[in-house]
Amino acid sequence: MFQDVLVITVAAGRGGDGAVSFRREKFVPKGGPDGGDGGRGGSVYLRARGSVDSLSRLSKRTYKAEDGEHGRGSQQHGRGGEDLVIEVPRGTRVFDADTGELLADLTEEGQTVLVARGGAGGRGNMHFVSPTRQAPRFAEAGEEGEKRRLRLELMLIADVGLVGYPNAGKSSLLAAMTRAHPKIAPYPFTTLSPNLGVVEVSEEERFTLADIPGIIEGASEGKGLGLEFLRHIARTRVLLYVLDAADEPLKTLETLRKEVGAYDPALLRRPSLVALNKVDLLEEEAVKALADALAREGLAVLPVSALTGAGLPALKEALHALVRSTPPPEMPKPVPRKEVQAGVEVVPVAEGVYEVRAPEVERYLARIKGDLMEAAGYLQEVFRRQGVEAALRAKGVRAGDLVRIGGLEFEYIPEV
């Protein structure tokens, strides 16, 4: 079953914990710390593949990459978690399901985007040795991997989009001009999902057609099937309005343009042609009168018959010329990935009480594993290196004042 909208959850792997371990071997009475590092958690990527034609292949609703292994003694590092690559159709747009931000537009074969970054592995206790800290009994825990909900929207990539009423002969026209085999039947709403076909102009030149389910009056208010599929013509360079010559084509064109404009006014400015289909059902004079009346609407009109093939060579040439002279439409650009902002902010919350907001420092605090008291010296080094000490002094924090940061609370003792 064709599916062009899907919400999934992606979760990257957690980083492995660093080990608290000491060398214990015969004849080595004072072995030092030898805790290995944890492995990095696997990340989650989306990759565009032309061989994938629908989001329905994504059978799961949650996708999780592998966690990193924990470090071990004897300086043994944990193995990194395996990355997870999810293949999606070309033309898939990726949104953050909670914020609505566009994260990626995967239009090229093999184009890959990182959607959930794996957590960093924690460092083992052998990294925290210093002249005053010979046997650290603490290490770093691994970071949690990113987790987010994604909304995937497939927008077909084609040069020409076919727009018309149900049973106007769009699928027949697609089949007559290309090697596509859409379902064709003498009743409305035969086409329930978009179809693609390639029109071969010569051995070197070709262009693609996209046929979407028929649009009816009131589609912009939720009637019928066509409106929800109009996104599939948003990328097309040219629109081809397919009209049934025997069924009020002037009124039909007016309705189609009204509904298309209600979906996206920019589509009305897209270069367009009119294919007056099923002319084999009318007399030549009637066809000419209809074509002249439609031409007064400001669009080039080509009488055709998908059944007999009449007018199709001229339609191919006209579409090809328009495609060649029209650049691809501008699409919304993805939002650049936001990195954690560095910096330190000291905020007074009460008399003699201050809160420190420093994302990078809070990351260090959250990852301490083991003896916190023994880690105090290391944390003081982190505070100095990250500018917390300087920020507290600049804010006028005095000895004995209460400082809160990352869930910890302590009395401030200025460095001498």
From Swiss-Prot:
Presence of the UniProt keyword Protease in the record: no
UniProt-listed Enzyme Commission number(s): 3.6.5.-
Annotated segments matching region Disordered: 25-44, 62-82
InterPro entries attached to this UniProt entry: G_OBG (IPR031167), GTP-bd (IPR006073), GTP-bd_Obg/CgtA (IPR014100), GTP-bd_prot_GTP1/OBG_C_sf (IPR036346), GTP1-OBG_CS (IPR006074), GTP1_OBG_dom (IPR006169), GTP1_OBG_dom_sf (IPR036726), OBG_GTPase (IPR045086)
Residue ranges of domain Obg in the record: 1-157
Residues of the OCT domain: 336-414
Highest taxon, organism lineage: Bacteria
Alphabetical list of Pfam families matching this protein: DUF1967, GTP1_OBG, MMR_HSR1
Keywords of the record: Cytoplasm, GTP-binding, Hydrolase, Magnesium, Metal-binding, Nucleotide-binding
CDD domains: Obg
Domain OBG-type G: 158-324
Residues annotated to bind Mg(2+): S171, T191
GO molecular function terms attached to this record: GTP binding; GTPase activity; magnesium ion binding
GO cellular component: cytoplasm
Positions annotated to bind GTP: 164-171, 189-193, 211-214, 277-280, 305-307
Localization of this protein: Cytoplasm
Ranges of Basic and acidic residues composition bias in the record: 63-72
Similarity comment text for this entry: Belongs to the TRAFAC class OBG-HflX-like GTPase superfamily. OBG GTPase family.
Entry protein name: GTPase Obg
Naturally occurring in which organism (per UniProt): Thermus thermophilus (strain ATCC 27634 / DSM 579 / HB8)
Designated gene of the protein: obg
